Amino acid sequence: MNRTASDPLHIIILGGGPAGSACGLALLKLAAEIKRAVKVTLLESKQFTGEQHYNQCVGVLSNPLPDLMERELLVPFPTDLTRALITGYTLHGDREELPLEGDAEPSIALRRVQYDGYMLESAIERGVQVLPARATNLEFHEDGVIVYTDSAPVEGDVLVGAFGMDEGSAAFFSRVTKYEPPQALSSVVTKYHPGTEAMEAFGKHIHAFLPKHPRIEFGGITPKGDYVTINIAGRNVDAPLMSDFLKQPAVRDALPNFEIARKNDADDLRYYKGRFPCSLARNYYGDRFVMIGDSAGLVRSFKGKGVTAAVQTGIRAAETILSVGFSRAAFHDHYRSANEDLIGDMSYGQTMRHVVIFMARSGMLDAVIRAAHKEPRLRHALFGAVSGHEPYRTIWGDSLAPASLTAILGAVLRRTH
């Protein structure tokens, strides 16, 4: 490799989403604080400016993300990108529904491609060098790492994987390391413009659906200013399944002015497909490499607060690299421990996910919703589950409280008589 001892520490980041941009910003901020020379190169082939590429995430952001950005990255939260404020949720079962309001600040709905572009531009302004190229292969050596691209190769000291669920990047990483990407759910996203009056009548709630359909784990309708975003997720959801979802009576009743979809905007009801992790990746760090965000599977069940987790893990990887090192032992001792808030809650979240799916498909969810109308603690648990504002450990505590269990049992018994 063509590197010398006098060269600054060179960190290469694969991926320019929030995780990669946050990691680059954190590296430069921390390096300035400890007066260490670093070079950060970020590889991203997508063009976020001009919205030439899209992110299939629904795009609802909430605390603690604004404070995290401003405190840890010195980057103001882009409130000017706000398309709508989300004040609560409406949970739909098969026949029942429940409005859920929390005490926290409203969440912010925005276009994810605009947020991603803002973060990447902020990183560039601070000194991150962005190479508009796609990584194609890599090599690890005792004295560094080489990333081959569809442009020129890049040599560095340590590699940060921030490529989300990109299967090509995961494949070449898996060939040269023991990395195994997280298991994934697929999603289909669409949108349409209902008109100003219909949007005002729709309100500021996200409508969350837990249908009986065996292939759909959850769906949602999210207001975004002058349009609504609709998404479904499951092991293998596809376009026909989205069309079926849109025909369900409970969904159709919630959709504002659906009959005018496509009449005012030719792009209405175009379907976009994506993937997101539903488990922790295996071997997501090693000598000279570490995964962050979706690439590591470091997210909550139901993908709540995915951007917050991406930014958090990007910052934590930067702290490990500059304060401890970039060996496998350094990442194991520091980076993994720093993410214990996410890792430790995963088993609770996975169990909650399976229980919710069982209740929805067995018809029990309606009884739980009826019980929550009367029991505040159960209602608080449901809000925490759909909003992502509470750890799943806390949600289980509220769900299994005697008052919650009594209310659920009473609702089930009334259903059977």
Residue ranges and their predicted role:
Residues N2-A19, T41:
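Beta1/beta-strand and adjacent pyrophosphate-binding region of the FAD-binding site
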Residues L14, L28-Y54:
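Glycine-rich FAD pyrophosphate-binding loop
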Residues A26-K29, S122-F258, L280, G297:
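Predominantly flavin-linked oxidoreductase catalytic cores and closely associated redox partners
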Residues S45-T90:
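N-terminal FAD cofactor-binding segment of flavoenzymes
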Residues G59-N63, E101-S122, G168, T190, ...:
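Short beta-strand to alpha-helix junction loop
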Residues T82, N137, D238-I321, F326:
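FAD/FMN-dependent oxidoreductases across multiple families
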Residues D94-R111, I146, P223-G234:
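Helix-loop-beta segment of a Rossmann-like dinucleotide-binding subdomain
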Residues L322-H417:
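C-terminal helical "tail/cap" subdomain of flavin- and related membrane-associated enzymes
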